[in-house]
């Protein structure tokens, strides 16, 4: 079932055909544990104080979680409970799994937000004129290759991890443990700048498991109950390569296997390597941190342009300076898939979107405690989030 050792890399593709790979990780991956804890802390503050200013980083290793960062808030938050509840939900509830919410040590090193930042960003300002919390550049991407306007590679990689979590929680595959990684390689055809998925070339799944399961049993279950339940049959063929549990053994996982840190899965969180990334992570940050809010807004713009039929594929870049409300620049790249010029599309964006942080927070309702849900399986391509509801454009 597993492919050859060399990975069967195919260099004989036709003109206009290429392969692209994206990966995702499950809830129990150590970096994702940290993302979820950071966003659980953010949500806990926003539930009591929608104006809380939060920048919360998390580190985890065997038997230990460290919270560090800067928070200014009226909320009274029990950090021990927030951390332990999050780990329990993820599924690390027994030391036999390498991590246990009941016995892990929780260290807290949180301070107030710097007054230098506060005075230039939000103090004595109308909400609409709140300044960006830092400088930076952010990207939004959309493509018509899927209904979600997301790359098929990352959509499937997320769904494979989510399916394993469902099978674990339901008890259908009781040998599964929370840490997992997936990777999907799709063969694409170029179509005048747009991309069309043709077939799946390779699927990789590595998932933590208990001791009393054989490798063959795991591989069979992953193919029959995970892949076939998630991946449309039209993309699979006799040449699709499967690397299922390629290490052969993955009993030690989660924070015991690797240290975790918030913000180390920024490509998993966004477009799986498609488009571009400005480098800023999302989790643990309130809306004044444009790393997060402006990336959500840029995705909203990109998806709205594609759904309006103005282009088939688009990359939107925005940039900011600390304390300045208006974006410094907005750029549109359509890969040649639009009947309009990029200047005309920029006019459409200016007429329909206000990308000041204080307006983004209102339009996308970013003071609500919705963030822990975003912290696994991707921030984009999921209809429950406001930035995934395309705006009806006037043009």
UniProtKB/Swiss-Prot annotation:
The modification S-nitrosocysteine is found at residue 120. It holds the Pfam family S-AdoMet_synt_C. L-methionine binds at residues 70, 113, 258, 289. Mg(2+) binds at residue 23. PROSITE patterns: ADOMET_SYNTHASE_1, ADOMET_SYNTHASE_2. Its EC number is 2.5.1.6. GO terms for molecular function: ATP binding; identical protein binding; metal ion binding; methionine adenosyltransferase activity. GO terms for cellular component: cytosol; methionine adenosyltransferase complex. It is an enzyme of class 2 (transferase). It catalyses: L-methionine + ATP + H2O = S-adenosyl-L-methionine + phosphate + diphosphate. Residues 113-125 are annotated as: Flexible loop. S-nitrosylation of Cys-120 inactivates the enzyme. Transmembrane segments: none annotated. GO terms for biological process: methionine catabolic process; one-carbon metabolic process; protein homotetramerization; S-adenosylmethionine biosynthetic process. It is linked to Methionine adenosyltransferase deficiency: An inborn error of metabolism resulting in isolated hypermethioninemia. Most patients have no clinical abnormalities, although some neurologic symptoms may be present in rare cases with severe loss of methionine adenosyltransferase activity. Belongs to the AdoMet synthase family. PANTHER family: S-ADENOSYLMETHIONINE SYNTHETASE. Homotetramer (MAT-I); dimer of dimers. Homodimer (MAT-III). This is S-adenosylmethionine synthase isoform type-1.
């Amino acid at each position: 079932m597993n492919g050859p050792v060399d990975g069967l890399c195919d260099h004989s593709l036709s003109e206009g055909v290429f392969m692209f790979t994206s990966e995702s990780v499950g809830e129990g991956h150590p970096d994702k544990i940290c993302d979820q804890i950071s966003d659980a802390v953010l949500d806990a503050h926003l539930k009591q104080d929608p104006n809380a200013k939060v920048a919360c980083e998390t580190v985890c290793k065997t038997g230990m979680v460290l919270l560090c960062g800067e928070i200014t808030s009226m909320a009274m938050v029990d950090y021990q409970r927030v951390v332990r509840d999050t780990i329990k939900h993820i599924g690390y509830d027994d030391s036999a799994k390498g991590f246990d919410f009941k016995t892990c040590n929780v260290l807290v090193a949180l301070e107030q937000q710097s007054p230098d930042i506060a005075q230039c960003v939000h103090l004595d300002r109308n909400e609409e004129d709140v300044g960006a919390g830092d400088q930076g550049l952010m990207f939004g991407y959309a493509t018509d290759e899927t209904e979600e306007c997301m790359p098929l590679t990352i959509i499937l990689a997320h769904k494979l991890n989510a399916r394993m979590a469902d099978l674990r929680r339901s008890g259908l595959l009781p040998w599964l443990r929370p840490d997992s990684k997936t990777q999907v390689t799709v063969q694409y055809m170029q179509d005048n700048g747009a991309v069309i998925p043709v077939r799946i070339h390779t699927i990789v799944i590595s998932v933590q498991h208990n001791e009393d399961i054989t490798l063959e049993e795991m591989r069979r279950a992953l193919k029959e109950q995970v892949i076939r339940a998630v991946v449309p049959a039209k993309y699979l063929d006799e040449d699709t390569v499967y690397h299922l549990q390629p290490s052969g053994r993955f009993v030690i996982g989660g924070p015991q296997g690797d240290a975790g840190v918030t913000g180390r899965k920024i490509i998993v969180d966004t477009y799986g390597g498609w488009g571009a990334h400005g480098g800023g992570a999302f989790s643990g940050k309130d809306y004044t941190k444009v790393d997060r809010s402006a990336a959500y807004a840029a995705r909203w713009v990109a998806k709205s342009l594609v759904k309006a039929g103005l282009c088939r594929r688009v990359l939107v870049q925005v940039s900011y300076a600390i304390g300045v409300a208006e974006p410094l620049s907005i750029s549109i790249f359509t890969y040649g898939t639009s009947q309009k010029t990029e200047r005309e599309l920029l006019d459409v964006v200016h007429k329909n979107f206000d990308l000041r942080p204080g307006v983004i927070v209102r339009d996308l309702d970013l003071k609500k405690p919705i963030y822990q849900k975003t912290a696994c399986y991707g921030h984009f391509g999921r209809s429950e989030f406001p930035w995934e509801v395309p705006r009806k454009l006037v043009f």
